[in-house]
């Protein structure tokens, strides 16, 4: 019985990335647009099955979402396919709370619903 995918701290993630690990954001598009960890690639959880081939199986991958649920699912799915997949502890929220850099400069980590509302207001997303 598994306890879930390995979890890495922010410091461990920074070290892994410096050593060549891939950083993948599995949040939705509107969350990605609000702010993301510098250097991350975007692969929403909903598209993981179709796009997993975009991830290099020969390098570790650190996945993150807002707080950990989606990155847990993504890491478990990738690990089942033979990837060295880990999830970032506390997600992008923990990253931002520590004052670590986000893109674009001044990016934010709003609540999921709040992010969508802000983007609707800014007319970046069509109204639903």
Name these PLM-found stretches.
Residues 1-22, 28-60, 69-128:
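Rhodanese-like catalytic fold shared by cysteine-dependent sulfurtransferases
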Residues 63-65:
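Short, surface-exposed ligand- or partner-binding patches at beta-edge/loop junctions that are enriched
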